[in-house]
């Protein structure tokens, strides 16, 4: 039998022994030094969006890789992306997120003012006061105040064709295409002997704003080069909406549209020449939209 004093002494001995061992372990254990982070200032992080989806096959051990690539060549759709177990591969997810981010940036950023200055495009703004209002109030994106229109009072009126550029839902579309499409379009029209009014830029503009421009300038044909709503395939797609004798409140069926103007669709220079041909036909037939037989 142990007495109470014996138990106390035993507990004290155990505690002393444990403390001695812990102290020895702390002294014997080397202190790990933090590893410095090495930053390669000359290193380049590859841009995943530069990879051509049509040639990038991510399926492991495909049954027929050649036929798979032939199919991918004809579409930018996300096929042949492969799986890691039941999940998408990391590269697939990163590309999806990168493309989605690019689409968001295209909507919420403004067109680079240096490009507008370089193209000598005077800027006016619709009745939208911000990007948020532009998204939530499309009706205001179709209206332009008299004060804004007065900025263009020195511009020639009643030309055969009035062209202008607008950001629409993609500022990136304007930045990527306007330098090529606008000169090609004007050159094509002037080559046909068609008079063209001086182009300008409408900020926060919807397609319907072209009707206000049509009435203000009195041109026979009005053409707006506007950024399309971006998607996961491209954020740089532009469209041309063209109308003969446009008026505020006219039906949408009176507009002719040339869409998918981007490097992966119709190239900007080619689109400019094609639009010039359409406008020439409009002036000859005095019609646009469904009334114009192309």
Curated annotation (Swiss-Prot):
Cofactor note: Binds between the large and small subunits.
MF-aspect GO terms: cobalamin binding; ethanolamine ammonia-lyase activity
Keyword set, alphabetical order: Bacterial microcompartment, Cobalamin, Cobalt, Lyase
DNA-binding in keyword set: no
Record has Protein biosynthesis as a keyword: no
Catalytic activity line of the entry: ethanolamine = acetaldehyde + NH4(+)
EC number(s) stated in the UniProt entry for this protein: 4.3.1.7
Subcellular location: Bacterial microcompartment
GO biological process, one term: ethanolamine catabolic process
One GO cellular component term noted in the UniProt record for this chain: ethanolamine ammonia-lyase complex
Family the UniProt entry places it in: Belongs to the EutC family.
Protein name (database record): Ethanolamine ammonia-lyase small subunit
Record organism: Clostridium tetani (strain Massachusetts / E88)
Organism lineage string: Bacteria, Bacillati, Bacillota, Clostridia, Eubacteriales
């Amino acid at each position: 039998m142990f007495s109470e004093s014996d138990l106390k002494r035993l507990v004290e001995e155990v505690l002393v022994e444990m403390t001695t061992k812990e102290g020895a372990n702390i002294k014997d254990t080397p202190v790990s030094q933090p590893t410095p982070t090495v930053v390669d200032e000359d290193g380049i992080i590859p841009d995943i969006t530069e990879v051509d989806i049509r040639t990038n096959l991510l399926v492991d051990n495909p049954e027929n890789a050649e036929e798979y690539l032939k199919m991918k060549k004809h579409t930018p759709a996300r096929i042949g992306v492969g799986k890691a177990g039941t999940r998408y591969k990391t590269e697939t997810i990163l590309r999806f997120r990168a493309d989605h981010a690019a689409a968001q940036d295209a909507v919420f950023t403004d067109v680079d003012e240096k490009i507008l200055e370089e193209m000598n495009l005077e800027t006016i703004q619709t009745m939208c006061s911000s990007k948020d209002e532009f998204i939530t109030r499309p009706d205001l994106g179709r209206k332009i105040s008299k004060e804004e229109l007065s900025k263009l009072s020195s511009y020639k009126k009643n030309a055969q064709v009035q062209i202008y550029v607008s950001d629409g839902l993609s500022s990136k579309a304007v930045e990527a295409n306007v330098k090529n499409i606008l000169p090609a379009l004007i050159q094509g029209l002037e080559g046909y002997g068609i008079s063209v009014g001086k182009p300008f830029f409408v900020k926060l503009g919807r397609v319907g704003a072209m009707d206000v421009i049509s009435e203000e300038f009195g041109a026979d044909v009005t053409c707006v080069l506007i950024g399309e709503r971006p998607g996961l395939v491209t954020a740089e797609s532009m469209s041309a909406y063209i109308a003969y004798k446009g008026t505020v409140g006219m039906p949408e069926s009176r507009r002719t549209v040339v869409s998918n103007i981007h490097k992966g669709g119709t190239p900007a220079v080619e689109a400019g020449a094609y639009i010039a041909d359409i406008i020439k036909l409009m002036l000859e037939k005095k019609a646009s939209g469904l009334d114009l037989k192309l």
